[in-house]
Amino acid sequence: MNDWHRIFTQNVLVPPHPQRARQPWKESTAFQCVLKWLDGPVIRQGVLEVLSEVECHLRVSFFDVTYRHFFGRTWKTTVKPTKRPPSRIVFNEPLYFHTSLNHPHIVAVVEVVAEGKKRDGSLQTLSCGFGILRIFSNQPDSPISASQDKRLRLYHGTPRALLHPLLQDPAEQNRHMTLIENCSLQYTLKPHPALEPAFHLLPENLLVSGLQQIPGLLPAHGESGDALRKPRLQKPITGHLDDLFFTLYPSLEKFEEELLELHVQDHFQEGCGPLDGGALEILERRLRVGVHNGLGFVQRPQVVVLVPEMDVALTRSASFSRKVVSSSKTSSGSQALVLRSRLRLPEMVGHPAFAVIFQLEYVFSSPAGVDGNAASVTSLSNLACMHMVRWAVWNPLLEADSGRVTLPLQGGIQPNPSHCLVYKVPSASMSSEEVKQVESGTLRFQFSLGSEEHLDAPTEPVSGPKVERRPSRKPPTSPSSPPAPVPRVLAAPQNSPVGPGLSISQLAASPRSPTQHCLARPTSQLPHGSQASPAQAQEFPLEAGISHLEADLSQTSLVLETSIAEQLQELPFTPLHAPIVVGTQTRSSAGQPSRASMVLLQSSGFPEILDANKQPAEAVSATEPVTFNPQKEESDCLQSNEMVLQFLAFSRVAQDCRGTSWPKTVYFTFQFYRFPPATTPRLQLVQLDEAGQPSSGALTHILVPVSRDGTFDAGSPGFQLRYMVGPGFLKPGERRCFARYLAVQTLQIDVWDGDSLLLIGSAAVQMKHLLRQGRPAVQASHELEVVATEYEQDNMVVSGDMLGFGRVKPIGVHSVVKGRLHLTLANVGHPCEQKVRGCSTLPPSRSRVISNDGASRFSGGSLLTTGSSRRKHVVQAQKLADVDSELAAMLLTHARQGKGPQDVSRESDATRRRKLERMRSVRLQEAGGDLGRRGTSVLAQQSVRTQHLRDLQVIAAYRERTKAESIASLLSLAITTEHTLHATLGVAEFFEFVLKNPHNTQHTVTVEIDNPELSVIVDSQEWRDFKGAAGLHTPVEEDMFHLRGSLAPQLYLRPHETAHVPFKFQSFSAGQLAMVQASPGLSNEKGMDAVSPWKSSAVPTKHAKVLFRASGGKPIAVLCLTVELQPHVVDQVFRFYHPELSFLKKAIRLPPWHTFPGAPVGMLGEDPPVHVRCSDPNVICETQNVGPGEPRDIFLKVASGPSPEIKDFFVIIYSDRWLATPTQTWQVYLHSLQRVDVSCVAGQLTRLSLVLRGTQTVRKVRAFTSHPQELKTDPKGVFVLPPRGVQDLHVGVRPLRAGSRFVHLNLVDVDCHQLVASWLVCLCCRQPLISKAFEIMLAAGEGKGVNKRITYTNPYPSRRTFHLHSDHPELLRFREDSFQVGGGETYTIGLQFAPSQRVGEEEILIYINDHEDKNEEAFCVKVIYQ
């Protein structure tokens, strides 16, 4: 509730001039105004001399030139410091508003305000000038549409000068206005239609900043924080209210009697003549209910009719209107006003500033005139008037989803959302003795959020009580009749529009105008056809539904009812695209190398891995099961683990026989544990002489490091790197986590082509064999399948893949084995030093309780030093410029007083002048032998002595002035505690601070934090769970903190009481951690230094400060946190290739929850809740449950950048409600590529050209493609790309198969091995018409192949040349790739079928193309391998 009151009180608007409110209403127009910078010496020199620390800001207000009236609310920019001399002041602040007063005389006044401190320390604010910003042109219906920069001229004086009667429009041409020379404000003003969907959240004529948080709008994406540039509405929540009871004390009868008596007295005192109190009657008791966001009503409030509690059963037979004075016949004993119907509020939003406003109104009327005679219906309508008597506000966020609520009613002169006078609250001046001693009344109701069922709802219909008219009253007017008279309204009109079927008060009653005070005074008639107050139309363009409509609804009332569209209810989410199942892209099989491969590896001369005793490490089999004993790992005497990764060989598989080129060089990327992501150097693939033809499991190529000149190193082959994981790296208690990481996690390795920079594939290896289990060293050799994964487009894999409600099978993901990686992993144990071992045995719980007992305290000494205690009593002279530069500069001001403040020497000048003075005195002393110079020396010494006396006086005055500040800053060290946290991405670091009240009096301590990533744990259950996970046994207190909305939490401390304040630090930002990737810090086999994660200075460090302020505002404790961010564990890596400057939408399906590492055994029942967070705020990442018992999907929506940008971010998944420890951490890479769409025919050549744009320097480049058999480029080899030039790259595409798929094309700098450009060629290929079909049976297995022949007849009368192609070049070869045949002649085509290793069927297409490579015919050969 505090949020609503705060926003409501801070955004009170001054309404436009009443004459503007009477004009016809027009549609509101939205604008965006960007105040860029201020040029020129706006701030006078005299102001800069009088004030210190001068700052500047702008103020913007609306002004009506016609009526000389300021309205709306003054908006202020952020304060910017000024420089001497004044130069350009940059603001760059966006300003938004919308208004329907599109008249040229409606302008915005921009005022330049300077503020600074006077000599006595008080703050002084001065107006330095103003400008008139014209919003609309001379044509009222045409706003300024130019969006280019404009300059606003500034005038001397303040905007209050516009109120002077001598200033006539145009004010800019008035002789009393004086321009400020060479001063202007740069700005842009343009319409902003994107703000129209948020009009209901922003009142008209309200100036708001794009950086301001608007209740009902989602925060902006990115770092700009401008939520109004593209507003995004929050999801609404439907609320229902039932059984509303208004209780007015001491009773409803007494309350209404006194209300009528006071109305009669007020009527007589205002000089309107006597009025019989018995003749005044209550027509209706109405309730207005609306949703308010602190700025204004979101929709026009609903209007319903209340009835006395005792009259509920009589409303169908008795008349509703009655005379209050006859209490014996009506409401005797009635204690409450009741609403029988249900209220539906579909515009609620889950925001602390959204509240429901209840307004209780009474409609009065007198059936007799002033002279006592019967009045006509017209006079009755004129005498009707409505008054608000009570109101209440309720914030649903503070309650549960359903329940009963009791609210106190408010009244009196305090501000309310309708900005009108309210009947006063009970006071001592009341005439009734019972009213004096009771409250203002209460409101009780039952509520439910997001539910359509009634809560204890009555059996009557939802519609309100039917109103029966008296026979003497005239029926309501028809829609064609002129509207009833409506009094003038200045602020927040509440009258409902006239329509058929409404009650009599709906036709005649309206809110009382502040300019009319007499109840019986008739208002002036509105002319026929004119509209009511336009302010009500501009604030509420649609009338809310009214519950007291009669049964005979006419067409107008039906339009009223249907104009308020109900909010559509969201159905359970069902994905239409195929999600990626976690694990499918890294399902490479791993095994142990064969004995033949081991012979080749051993004979190649790879370095041997030795333990600490220089003995070979124990070799374990990668296929043997591993028994993990955590106690055995922790009790190991070798506390340090040296992790060794040896990349040995990369072999080609026999299945990869499509004619694709084999890479010459490769490099690997991966991330091990919390170490920075690693990228190995380029390694040469050297073919073994003994390898021969590739077969299943055969070793073909070994890895050799490449030197700088491009040749491979003749030394030992392979590449080796080491990671040292010891007590110096691991945090206290982290060793068990590292052992569990080795036991359950897999290491994913990406293999890249070192020349084309294309991804070859990925491999995954389990690390459980690295657990030493008490052994000195272990090593395991692995043979890993390198798998390439391709993701099809979502629109290609939709149909036919739905398995049930919310289920999609993992289609659209194709994997191909590209090769086999031979890798050796080893773990070598080392003993650690004794001092390091001592710090590693610190219990984890000790570091989670921070006490200020050991804080440094001031121990005396100079105030100019750092205050640190010295063990040795040694006083060493220091340079004054080093100790206090300000004092050193002051000591030299006497010599330059006449040159102005701009010539004050700097620190270096002060030091240099002092040295010159000392040198001069030394030379004068050396010349003491000369009698003539001796007198000069004496005069110089006297001058120096006089100068020293002056310096001492300046020093004494300066020390006296800064003594209080220096003492206070040094004494604050006594209450300051410093602590260092080692945080990881997504992990909540929990700790407690022991706070003690050092005073003899109780205090309410406010906890102020300057870092949003650090927060106080205010939920006791969350505190309890964190303590249980950390193993702390300190007490937990319920309701420890007093929460005040968005303000800082408070807690109460008794004298000398100690309390444990719980904190948690959690960071989801990984922006600077990406810098660590540039310096992996790897070491090869020749440099055996282990990798240390702290060698790189790119590891970011954050700081947070917590201030504990007592009741008087003085701090009693200060906690300074230094947060050292550490690299984190990555469980899964995803790589997506997507067209540039578009959105990637992907769904990643989670496997069953019990299969995740670390899940409890037997957890097969209800899955825990899944929460997801992303390190990039510009990425939309969410999770939804598809249905009961269905799997969960993680949805990503990422905007790709320009090509060839690579965007990486982390997705963090939690399974606990407090988001304490991530269950999974994924790293997602998005490669932005230039998209090229190609529609072609299989087997036929399609040509296109790509434009290459040169960079700043000359580059030698080459084009590489992922499918060289299907896509060829011209130039084919290396060519020169001129600087800043344009060159064409010719591309020929011949797809071998029909279908849709992606082909990657990279342009690489061959000298620097950098990616210059990259394209994503999207092929949409159709199959040609098959003219002939053949069938052949072949034997599977080893063989020489089979030769066959088919004939082809030239259908043309002339001689033609034809070219032959096949969609399976590895299975079918032609005797001749092209042939010539005469017109009408027949040619025999020779075919050679290669043997196949597996049994099955294969359809091979033969494409016969003409001389232009267009398809003439296509044959299909069905091969059956037996």
Curated annotation (Swiss-Prot):
Tissues showing expression: Expressed in kidney, skeletal muscle, heart and liver, and to a lesser extent in brain and lung.
Cystine bridges: none
Domain of life: Eukaryota
Chief subcellular location: cytoplasm
Region (Sufficient for basal bodies localization): 823-1426
Disordered as annotated region, ranges: 450-536, 896-935
Localization (cell): Cytoplasm, Cytoskeleton, Cilium basal body; Cytoplasm, Cytoskeleton, Microtubule organizing center, Centrosome; Cell junction, Tight junction; Nucleus
Comp. bias (Pro residues): 474-486
Keyword list, A-Z: Cell junction, Cell projection, Ciliopathy, Cilium, Cytoplasm, Cytoskeleton, Disease variant, Leber congenital amaurosis, Nephronophthisis, Nucleus, Phosphoprotein, Senior-Loken syndrome, Tight junction
Residue ranges with Polar residues bias: 503-536
Residues bearing PTM Phosphoserine: 142
Any one GO molecular function term: structural molecule activity
Cytoplasm found in the keyword field: yes
Outcome following mutation: residue 1225 to M: In SLSN4; benign
Signal peptide (residue range): none
One CC-aspect GO term: cell-cell junction
Biological process (GO), any one: flagellated sperm motility
Family of the protein in this entry: Belongs to the NPHP4 family.
Function as written in the Swiss-Prot or TrEMBL entry: Involved in the organization of apical junctions; the function is proposed to implicate a NPHP1-4-8 module. Does not seem to be strictly required for ciliogenesis. Required for building functional cilia. Involved in the organization of the subapical actin network in multiciliated epithelial cells. Seems to recruit INT to basal bodies of motile cilia which subsequently interacts with actin-modifying proteins such as DAAM1.
Annotated disease: Nephronophthisis 4: An autosomal recessive inherited disease resulting in end-stage renal disease at age ranging between 6 and 35 years. It is a progressive tubulo-interstitial kidney disorder characterized by polydipsia, polyuria, anemia and growth retardation. The most prominent histological features are modifications of the tubules with thickening of the basement membrane, interstitial fibrosis and, in the advanced stages, medullary cysts. Ciliary dysfunction leads to a broad spectrum of disorders, collectively termed ciliopathies. Overlapping clinical features include retinal degeneration, renal cystic disease, skeletal abnormalities, fibrosis of various organ, and a complex range of anatomical and functional defects of the central and peripheral nervous system. The ciliopathy range of diseases includes Meckel-Gruber syndrome, Bardet-Biedl syndrome, Joubert syndrome, nephronophtisis, Senior-Loken syndrome, and Jeune asphyxiating thoracic dystrophy among others.
Subunit composition and interactions: Interacts with NPHP1. Interacts with NPHP1 and RPGRIP1L/NPHP8; NPHP1, NPHP4 and RPGRIP1L are proposed to form a functional NPHP1-4-8 module localized to cell-cell contacts and the ciliary transition zone; NPHP4 mediates the interaction between NPHP1 and RPGRIP1L. Interacts with IQCB1/NPHP5; the interaction likely requires additional interactors. Interacts with RPGRIP1, CEP164, JADE1, PALS1, INADL, PARD6A, INVS, DVL2, LATS1. Interacts with INTU; INTU mediates the interaction between NPHP4 and DAAM1. Interacts with SPATA7.
The protein's name: Nephrocystin-4
